[in-house]
Curated annotation (Swiss-Prot):
It comes from Staphylococcus aureus (strain MSSA476). Catalyzes the dephosphorylation of undecaprenyl diphosphate (UPP). Confers resistance to bacitracin. Bacitracin is thought to be involved in the inhibition of peptidoglycan synthesis by sequestering undecaprenyl diphosphate, thereby reducing the pool of lipid carrier available. Belongs to the UppP family. Pfam families: BacA. It is a multi-pass membrane protein. One of its GO terms (biological process) is response to antibiotic. The chain crosses the membrane at residues 1-21, 48-68, 102-122, 126-146, 162-182, 203-223, 236-256, 267-287. This is Undecaprenyl-diphosphatase. Its EC number is 3.6.1.27.
Amino acid sequence: MFIIELIKGIILGVVEGLTEFAPVSSTGHMILVDDMWLKSSEFLGSQSAFTFKIVIQLGSVFAAAWVFRERFLEILHIGKHKHVEGDNNQQRRSKPRRLNLLHVLVGMVPAGILGLLFDDFIEEHLFSVPTVMIGLFVGAIYMIIADKYSAKVKNPQTVDQINYFQAFVIGISQAVAMWPGFSRSGSTISTGVLMKLNHKAASDFTFIMAVPIMLAASGLSLLKHYQDIQITDIPFYILGFLAAFTVGLIAIKTFLHLINKIKLIPFAIYRIVLVIFIAILYFGFGIGKGI
């Protein structure tokens, strides 16, 4: 049984790594895979299972931090300073990157404030199957609207052309995505596209902005729940973290490589199908009623 439970922990880490930064809602997938199927709370205990999810989320966050490590060093003015591509070498030498630490901080402020104010309320009242289904569906519609709009934009901006107002508006959408199932990346990438960024630029800024705030949020959660960690559960935590980190690296790099080509609508369609599937399990078979 111990081996089977370890495999379950790895599966959850894989799911987290695949979905945390994709615009499909990691929360929705965790409800489907864990709460409705694997039920980690049954072999870890409810409190330890909650802490386990924080740990595997950290695995995904560290993966994103690694992918964007050079950009973070540039933003913090550590190491070599790169420049924006221009029409010639002189332009490249004279135009520094516009994305800086203030852009990231401006984007983090709305979610940071609302997170501190409403984190406990959201944790207690909004983590249910019906609310997650609502978030999945509404988020999918928002993504479709963003993609339809982006088709009309002739010269979408790169991440280094972002201004502070755009950063702030994208930050507000990150706060809206605190509703479980809405998807942080789905919300912020869509908003970035609506603010006339190209899909890759919106994705880059989404991940860069998300890493520090998610590290802070996960760190606070661990401080609140670290006492729930049992020594016997440590193998689950380690394997789950490593699975989320490894799969997260692959998923993030693949997503960033493809997003300008495939856009958001395929993910939106997938979300709607996922809502239908969860609804059938929940309303048709009563699976997940206790969540």
